[in-house]
Amino acid sequence: MEFQLFSPYTIKDVTLKNRIIMSPMCMYSSENEDGQVTNFHLVHYGTRAAGQVGLVMIEATAVLPEGRISNKDLGIWDDNLIEGLHKTTTFIHNNGAKAAIQLAHAGRKAELETDAFAPSAIPFNDRMKIPVEMNKQQIKETVSAFQKAALRSKRAGVDVIELHGAHGYLINEFLSPLSNKRIDEYGGSPENRYRFLREIIDAVNEVWNGPLFVRISANDYHPDGLTVQDYVQYTGWMKEQGVDLIDCSSGAVVPAHIDVYPGYQVQYAKHIKEHVNIATGAVGLITTGSQAEQILNNNEADLIFIGRELLRNPYFPRIAANELGFELKEPYQYRRAPGKIKTNK
């Protein structure tokens, strides 16, 4: 029997062996605080690849040192960081998966001893520092940093690049009227608030012709914030610029209460897919193979991003295959142990 979850998916010239994506999740494990990959990262990502994930996405990787969430984040702001990332993508490829990287700038949510930077001098909450409002030169330099990071990603051997435009980090801060109070060409109207991301996408496209994803927060969960309908407009512009897939998350641009339940963000992937006619990824409390298969069968998304469930079990694809009754081909090293994986569920 055929299952969509385990069917190939092609984006441009990259074919994923299945629809299961390892969602980018910060590990805060660059122990020397220099942005470098460590042995932990090789094991962490290589294990998920061996577990038969179709696309392993490296966590939010800072395009500038001041763009880290913490001082133990991975970085891609210098050429000396390429080698470790290349080792990581090689590990991923050698274990049968494609490799992606999420390029990021934390903006006002950077928790470092140095200044944080944002579109406006508004802190995320009363616990965090007031950020420095970026001037136009700093905006230009940050756009350039994303472009250089994309070029380094290419040299590091990634197959897919994702821009982190969600969860209240810098790109998201420019998009949302809750965090962007500028009165110049980067603030005010939706077109102006989109300008920063537009310039980043244009800059990345100059050096990268592979698949390009953007992660969005499709709902600010605030009466004066953005909704999924606002993102229909934004993602329409992204599509015009050549973005291939929208990774649909939500929230975290301002403190908010969010009611979570299994698949609570799938509605956003479905809405964007239907109204913009662009490929989408569903993410958020997707924990079983049958749930993931139903999302695909209902045409609510094209890819399934799995986060915490892959932290709980790096062999989630095997568990999902067992549940669905699909015979998943194991790595040749493990073929002496065929059959179902037993679980406590």
UniProtKB/Swiss-Prot annotation:
Q: Which SUPFAM superfamilies match?
A: FMN-linked oxidoreductases
Q: Which residues form the signal peptide?
A: none
| Cofactor(s) the protein needs | FMN
Gene3D superfamilies recorded for this chain? Aldolase class I
Which positions in this protein are listed as binding substrate?
28, 164-167
Q: What is its EC number?
A: 1.6.99.1
Catalytic reactions on record: A + NADPH + H(+) = AH2 + NADP(+)
Instruction: State the Gene Ontology terms under molecular function.
Output: FMN binding; NADP binding; NADPH dehydrogenase activity
Kindly state which keywords UniProt assigns to this record, in alphabetical order: Detoxification, Flavoprotein, FMN, NADP, Oxidoreductase
Say which domain of life the source belongs to.
Bacteria
Q: Is-annotated flag, keyword Oxidoreductase?
A: yes
Gene Ontology biological-process entries: response to toxic substance
Does the record bear tRNA processing in its keywords? no
Residues engaged in binding FMN: 23-26, 60, 102, 215, 307-308
The enzyme's main class, written as a single word, is: oxidoreductase
Task: Write down the InterPro entries for this protein, in alphabetical order.
Answer: Aldolase_TIM, NADPH_DH_bac, OxRdtase_FMN_N, YqjM-like
Listed PANTHER family:
NADPH DEHYDROGENASE C23G7.10C-RELATED
Q: What does the UniProt function comment say about this protein?
A: Catalyzes the reduction of the double bond of an array of alpha,beta-unsaturated aldehydes and ketones. It also reduces the nitro group of nitroester and nitroaromatic compounds. It could have a role in detoxification processes.
Q: How does it assemble?
A: Homotetramer.
Family note: Belongs to the NADH:flavin oxidoreductase/NADH oxidase family. NamA subfamily.
Q: What is the name of this protein? A: NADPH dehydrogenase
Q: Which organism is it from?
A: Bacillus mycoides (strain KBAB4) (Bacillus weihenstephanensis)
The record lists the lineage as: Bacteria, Bacillati, Bacillota, Bacilli, Bacillales
